[in-house]
Swiss-Prot record:
Cited Pfam families: HMD, HMD_N
GO molecular function: oxidoreductase activity
Cross-referenced SUPFAM superfamilies: 6-phosphogluconate dehydrogenase C-terminal domain-like, NAD(P)-binding Rossmann-fold domains
Keyword RNA-binding among record annotations: no
Top-rank lineage group of the source organism: Archaea
Lineage: Archaea, Methanobacteriati, Methanobacteriota, Methanomada group, Methanococci
Keywords: Oxidoreductase
The protein's name: H(2)-forming methylenetetrahydromethanopterin dehydrogenase-related protein MJ1338
Record-stated family: Belongs to the HMD family.
InterPro entries linked: 6-PGluconate_DH-like_C_sf, HMD_C, HMD_C_sf, HMD_N, HMDII/III, METHMP_Hmd, NAD(P)-bd_dom_sf
Length: 353
């Protein structure tokens, strides 16, 4: 982990929701041995680090049994105030960090606290929900009674408390220009991260989950493949840049669409790993294509259980289209609120976990 110098900023009022499942971190994932660091991990560690940076921190956790008494003592000894009531925490913070469970619980907590947060507060997701979906779930009140409240991210992109956690991913303006939070609110989130000695990466809100969630494994491998093909296509084959980009779009869109309709197993069945190994092997044109070597090895040694599941899988009807072209068509042919509604509903489906 890079050694990031802490910066001194004005004292902030911070509310963290959720201490983190210590049984999962310590006993099931065995983080102390695998990654290092020391408990408590998760939201409670974030609260500790924010408090140690000089901020006024409240940790809301209704389930005291989620941690042992000695770990709770560590939290309180750091200067964190522990409460069981989300509303009490809501009234406290100018920055609200949701280290909350996957699913409906996070939306329920967000809808509870937004009524009570101070003026110009910012509510930040972590790893259990996309900031885009969080915004959509709160949109009715954000566009009426609480226009002052911003939505961003304070995504650790690692488990807080492990040496790997040296950064936060913060959601900024979306790729289509939507401002879910003001520049001042995003700046506060950046300053909070840096004050705790973390690197702050501001990325488009609708990209944050792709680079910060567990699916970043897929992002990294896919990006490596794209860049490998780009290098080979341009330097060795001398293919036109537009053609390379079009084939990348076709490949990624096809895979994504098949997963959406037919699941992982259905996608694998449609792509036929045996055939893919043969065709992709012919693209091994440089010695340094280590990513392709690794991919071919994985495809040649698929798990027998997965093979059986793929054999039984169904390839369901899938309409393969260029997504951005379809959006333009909908806006042109339908237009207005109907088009925006259809696009928004589709976006929610994309970003929901």
């Amino acid at each position: 982990m890079r050694n990031i110098r802490k910066i001194k900023v004005d004292n902030m009022k911070v509310s963290v929701y959720g201490a983190g499942n210590q049984n999962l971190y310590i006993n099931k994932l065995n983080l102390p041995e695998k990654f290092g660091g020391e408990p408590p991990y998760g939201g409670s560690r974030m609260a500790i680090e924010f408090a140690e940076a000089g901020h006024d921190v409240v940790l809301a956790e209704p389930n005291k049994n989620i941690m042992s008494d000695d770990l709770w003592k560590k939290v309180e000894d750091a200067g964190v105030k522990v409460v069981s009531d989300d509303v009490e925490a809501a009234k406290h913070g100018e920055i609200h960090v949701l280290f909350t469970p996957f699913g409906k619980a996070t939306f329920r907590i967000a809808k509870t606290i937004i009524e009570h947060v101070p003026e110009n507060a910012v509510i930040c997701n972590t790893c259990t929900v996309s900031p885009v979906v969080l915004y959509y779930s709160l949109e009715p009140i954000l566009r009426t009674k609480r226009k002052d409240v911003g939505i961003s991210s304070m995504h650790p992109a690692a488990v807080p408390g492990t040496p790997q956690h040296g950064h936060y991913v913060i959601g900024g303006k979306t790729t289509d220009g939507k401002e879910l939070a003001t520049e001042e609110q995003i700046k506060k989130a950046v300053e909070l991260a840096k004050s705790a000695g973390k690197e702050a990466y501001v990325v488009p809100a609708d990209v944050s989950s792709v680079v910060a969630d567990m699916g970043s494994l897929v992002t990294a491998v896919a990006l490596s493949g794209v860049l490998d093909y780009y290098t080979v296509g341009r330097k060795i084959i001398n293919a036109p840049k537009k053609m390379i980009e079009q084939q990348v779009i076709m490949t990624l869109q096809t895979m994504a669409s098949l997963v959406e309709t037919s699941g992982i197993e259905g996608m694998v069945k449609a792509l036929n790993p045996e055939l893919l190994i043969r065709s992709a092997s012919s693209m091994k044109l440089l010695d340094r294509q280590k990513d392709l070597d690794a991919a071919l090895e994985i495809l040649q040694n698929l798990d027998e259980t997965l093979k059986a599941e793929v054999e039984k899988a169904e390839i369901k009807p899938t309409t393969l289209v260029a997504a951005q072209s379809l959006v333009k068509e909908i806006k042109t042919l339908i237009g207005g609120a109907a088009a925006e509604g259809a696009i928004k509903r589709s976006a929610r489906k994309l970003f929901e976990h």
